[in-house]
Amino acid sequence: MAEELKAKGNAAFSKKDYKTAIDYFTQAIGLDERNHILYSNRSACYASEKDYADALKDATKCTELKPDWAKGWSRKGAALHGLGDLDAARSAYEEGLKHDANNAQLLNGLKSVEAAQTQAASGAGGFNPFAKLGSQLSDPKFMEKLASNPETASLLADSAFMAKLQKIQQNPGSIMAELNDPRMMKVIGMLMGIDINMNAGEGAAEEQEKKEEFAPSSSTPSADSAKPETTNPPPQPQASEPMEEDKTAEELEEAATKEALKKKADQEKQIGNENYKKRNFPVAIEQYKKAWDTYKDITYLNNLAAAYFEADQLDDCIKTCEDAIEQGRELRADFKLIAKALGRLGTTYQKRGDLVKAIDYYQRSLTEHRTPDILSRLKDAEKSKELQDREAYIDPDKAEESRVKGNELFKSGDFANAIKEYTEMTKRAPSDPRGFGNRAAAYLKVMAPAECIRDCNKAIELDPNFAKAYVRKAQALFMLKDYNKCIDACNEASEVDRREPNTGKNLREIESQLSKCMSAMASQRQNETEEETMARIQKDPEVLGILQDPAMQAILGQARENPAALMEHMKNPTVKSKIEKLIASGVIRLG
């Protein structure tokens, strides 16, 4: 990602779009703060914008990250020269030459600084009138001085000039380009304490005299004093200058070689891809190996790992993925490619049945880059691991131990700990309905009917002939005062209890529970008038459904003419349950 941004920055620099280039390099630095080339490139952009202060900051950072890189010192020297600090600029160029004595840019930069120093020293009496302008412009009292001077006070109302002045304050080195502006000369004169207008007039006259002479004498005192300082402008990077570094012939040849190798590697990869699609994995593997040996891009290793996986060479797949991750870190590869290698490791370990490692690698892959595919694989692996753990925990002998302990605790009245033992039994023997049935009985004792019903349903699912589970379910429904469902549960229990292996041994308990339910429903409608009964029935959808059933209407019609016929119909468990509900609701009155 950082390399892509750098390439975009280089392209913008070539087009002299320095602000856009700065933005791209800034983004790249955010992703790769230790890359010295990025700071060097951005320094060049700032220098092109004549923002030598920021150019110096980046150049300094570049030399801190890689002190032995000559290019960084060249950037620093150029920035210092732009700021007018010739001594420091010279030191920077000299430091760079210690690392690369033949670097043409450093040598040219040093010559430029030396020439500027010589020119500054050769002024009248060695006096350089513009040497300290930068510090004077940044003086907090500068604006106050400007306003108090009659010659410059009027400039405060000139917004265009004030904007120009503000830019010069930010970058004092750019003042040299504004010396033709008479307003700027007034400011310089105010700062230097001289009358620029007067001197300029004298200089103009003397300059005219100089023009009239074909061979002016070098000893003419006014010829030099009338001219503004002609310090060479600070060196600036040219648009055609390579951004990353100054390429020597050898380096250019190396870059061309790399490009050719990458192209050749991609051709090998393409052949590998074609064979992979044909499931010709041995050939695909060899092609991906050739691609990696030709050019170091972990895309080739990821492809190689995929081929090993499909060929069921899992050891080779794991090793290749590990190499891809290690090499990817060293090559600063895209995090998406590293995430892909981590995800492949997860898939490989899952195929081997090592779900612990599979889950770990899936999680690490998602940390690098989150994708729906890996997230789905992680969830599947976690579910499989949970199931695997449950199956590994199964132990019938320990389940029996927990059942015995639970029964003892139940008999002693310690229902809470009995529930714990029965829960352990359900984990050790999840297919044994007794664990759920016994825990349901304990839940009843601690007044937890909902939990009891849940366990009864599970026990019935495991063993449809478990009559005790139906009885306990009826008891829990009675506790919830859901009498209609309680009647259904009692009738189901009665039906199951008749079958083997029960043979009616729970009949008394079932009839007792049914009787309690009928009594409770009768007590609800005690002292109820017929009008109140009809109003209540109209609000009971289950009773209304029974009354609207054509078959039940026929049975009730027969019962009115022949009450004995009703007893015959009640031999059918379904009809019996419905008639009991009608009796309990008061639709049918006995006696």
Swiss-Prot record:
TPR repeat ranges per the UniProt record: 2-35, 36-69, 70-103, 265-298, 299-331, 339-372, 399-432, 433-466, 467-500
Keyword field: Cytoplasm, Repeat, Stress response, TPR repeat
Biased composition (Low complexity): 215-225
Segments for region (Disordered): 202-255
Keyword Repeat applies: yes
Subcellular localization: Cytoplasm
Presence of the UniProt keyword Ligase in the record: no
Gene3D superfamilies named among the record's database cross-references: 1.10.260.100, Tetratricopeptide repeat domain
One cellular component term from this protein's GO annotations in UniProt: nucleus
Function: May play a role in mediating the heat shock response of some HSP70 genes.
Protein name per UniProt: Heat shock protein sti1 homolog
Gene (UniProt): sti1
